[in-house]
A protein has these predicted regions:
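Intrinsically disordered, charged and Pro/Gly-enriched terminal/linker segments
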Residues: 1-2, 10-21, 53-64, 98, ...
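Amphipathic alpha-helical segments of tetratricopeptide repeats
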Residues: 8-9, 42-54, 87-96, 129-141, ...
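Inter-helical turn/loop elements of alpha-helical hairpins
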Residues: 1-95, 112-127, 156-164, 197-202, ...
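Tandem amphipathic alpha-helical repeat scaffolds
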Residues: 18-34, 62-79, 101-119, 144-161, ...
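Short amphipathic alpha-helical recognition elements used for nucleic-acid or partner binding
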Residues: 427-459, 479, 557
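Intrinsically disordered or compositionally simple regulatory linkers and C-terminal tails
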Residues: 387, 391-416
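Alpha-helical solenoid repeat scaffolds used for protein-protein interaction
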Residues: 249, 253-254, 266-285, 291-394, ...
Length: 612
């Protein structure tokens, strides 16, 4: 399918048939050639003002159809009040048989209402889009019908946080479009967007491949850019930093020949690129894209504030992040589909700032993500932070977080702070005092269990083997009577049933820091610190079997605290650095370098101007 040829000014001026001009405007829409479309509508307006135009056929009204198209374009540009005014004029003036004008006006109304974002406006948007789809079906316009379903799914469901409803409606739109529709590739892009948010990366890849095949045939440049951008989002969700950076740059190159960077679309692209690159730890490039988006020549700076809050909450100054996140929450409208992320980032900044309440906030964020469709929404959108906050949310009573930690396992075991064993239903597994509980804690340190001889030597070092085995059987009997079969014997090995154990997760999280870079390394360091909720095994202070683990935990804990303190100091985040250094000093009282660093940060804080 060839793209519509561009019209010269002379050719445009020569067009004198309103039907031809409207047809041209409709044709340009799926190609994203909005400047040309606007020029066509301007030409139609001038033609109608000069008069001398032949009367329209029955059921058509050139002026009302022009107003409906203008309303559609205004809605796309977020000029909501102006779009509503034109829609009202069309609906007041149209006769019932002006089907095209009324149907297109309903499409514009749905879009404008969806941008308002309130629950009531969203309900009205659903009704307007449904009305438009029915009208388009009645006049035999499946292409427009598909567009009404698509916009209902994307603007009224997806942006309002109903991802499951969005998937269903956009799937219906795709099935409604004729196979040769120019709008079908764009619909597949929107479908991929929803699947990406749902964490369905493989399915999204398949839809992108299908859209790419159609795009290669029809050559719509805008869709090609959108497809590349969707692949960048998938790469970021999978944690592939190299692919993310490459695809972001590729999308930018493809967009240069278009008018993206002359509009709000260009600003959004730059800011979202900054967020994606920061997500995978490409900090320097993330900062460059943010600065370009911040300096973009558009008056509204709400998007800039949102991205700045995201970057700061993830790995910048947590105090400033909390201030910005609170300011955004007090604003006119935070898009419903990202409310969960706003709450999650608030929880993360709260934790990093050393304040109380992070677990409760994370639990709320998880519930909000589930309300969008599934907890995979959070896992796909903020994978590191979701994983990091899950233990805090579980301690705050979140059943969603508990399921995340268990991942099909039979127990949650906490050895930091007050030891606790939690069953899949959230109830506490009470352990008998003495050796039965100590045995559980010992085995919890060793994912694959311990040889029976090691257990016997640990608990009964000076007892004859047969007597030791008899006593161990008594310990296991007491344990089984109270806690059930949570310890099993495999041949000559004793082990705990599959369990999530905080100290094992702490070591694994610390190991992940080593392979990361930039801002992501700092996030992963904080993620490991989130698991350290107190001294290791305080209930077994004299147990020799715990000494090695205690020393390893102490060393790793100090390394992580020093890492986040150094990063905070480099960014001038003095309170954040001070919080980390104070925690390190509790572990190591003799570190003079840390005391000196704390004094420097205290002096810097005193030198800061007081807030007004």
């Amino acid at each position: 399918v060839a793209a519509p040829a561009e019209l010269t000014d002379e050719a445009l001026a020569a067009l004198s048939d309103p039907a031809v001009l409207l047809e041209r405007a409709w044709t340009l829409e799926p190609w994203g050639r909005y400047a040309e479309r606007s020029a066509i509508l301007d030409a139609l307006e001038r033609l109608l003002e000069t008069g001398g135009v032949a009367p329209p056929p029955p059921g058509r009204d050139w002026r009302l159809e022009l107003l409906a198209e203008r309303a559609i374009d205004l809605g796309r540009e977020f000029k909501i009040d102006q779009a509503h005014a034109l829609v009202d004029e069309v609906t007041r003036s149209a006769n019932p048989d002006h089907e095209i004008a009324l149907a297109r006006a309903m499409l514009a109304s749905g879009q404008a209402l969806a941008w308002v974002g309130t629950d009531e406006a969203t309900r009205q948007a659903h009704r307007a889009f449904a009305d438009a789809a029915e009208r388009f079906a009645a006049i035999g316009q499946p292409d427009w019908q598909g567009s009404a379903l698509l916009r209902r799914g994307y603007s009224a469901s997806y942006q309002h946080g109903d991802l499951v409803g969005a998937e269903e409606l956009i799937r219906e739109a795709i099935d409604t479009y004729p196979p040769d529709s120019m709008r079908l590739p764009g619909a597949l892009v929107s479908y991929a967007d929803v699947l990406i948010d749902l964490g369905e990366f493989d399915r999204a890849d398949a839809e992108i491949d299908r859209a790419l095949a159609l795009t290669d045939r029809v050559g719509i440049a805008k869709v090609r850019v959108d497809l590349t951008w969707a692949r960048a989002r998938i790469a970021a969700g999978r944690g592939d930093a190299r692919a993310t950076e490459r695809l972001v740059r590729e999308a930018e190159r493809e967009a240069i020949g278009m008018d993206w960077f002359k509009t709000h679309i260009g600003r959004s692209y730059l800011l979202e690129s900054a967020e994606l690159l920061d997500l995978v730890g490409v900090s320097d490039q993330a900062q460059r894209y943010f600065e370009r988006g911040r300096d973009h020549g558009v008056e509204d700076n709400g998007d800039v504030a949102q991205t700045m809050a995201v970057l700061r909450a993830r790995s910048g100054d947590p105090g400033l992040a909390l201030e910005q996140l609170q300011e955004l929450a007090r604003g006119d409208w935070l898009e419903k589909r990202v409310v969960w992320r706003h709450t999650l980032l608030t929880a993360w900044a709260t934790f990093r700032a050393g304040r109380d309440g992070a677990g409760e906030l994370a639990a709320r964020a998880f519930e909000q993500a589930v309300a969008c469709g599934t907890i995979r929404v959070a896992q796909a959108g903020e994978p590191d932070i979701t994983a990091a906050l899950a233990p805090l949310a579980e301690r705050a009573g979140s059943p969603v977080a508990r399921e995340l930690l268990l991942a099909g396992r039979g127990l949650i075991v906490r050895l930091f702070g007050t030891p606790a064993v939690v069953a899949p239903d959230g109830s506490e597994v009470r352990l008998p005092p003495g050796m039965p509980g100590e045995l559980v804690r010992l085995l919890a340190l060793h994912e694959h269990g311990l040889p029976l001889e090691v257990v016997l030597e640990t608990f009964f070092p000076d007892v004859a083997p047969e007597v030791a085995r008899q006593r161990l059987r008594q310990v296991l009997t007491r344990l089984r009577a109270t806690a059930g079969d949570i310890v099993v014997r495999d041949g000559e090995t004793l082990r705990l049933i599959p369990a999530w154990v905080d100290v094992r997760e702490f070591f694994a999280a610390g190991n992940r820091v080593r392979g990361a870079r930039g801002s992501r390394a700092v996030r992963l360091a904080y993620a490991a610190l989130a698991l350290h909720s107190g001294p290791l095994l305080p209930s077994d202070p004299y147990a020799g079997w715990a000494e090695d683990s205690r020393e390893r935990v102490r060393y790793r804990h100090l390394v992580l605290l020093d890492q986040v303190a150094a990063d905070a100091a480099a960014r001038g985040s003095h309170q954040e650095a001070l919080t980390a250094l104070e925690a390190a000093l509790e572990e190591d009282q003799n570190a003079e370098e840390r005391r000196a660093a704390m004094n420097r940060h205290l002096q810097a804080l005193r030198a800061q101007p007081a807030a007004t």
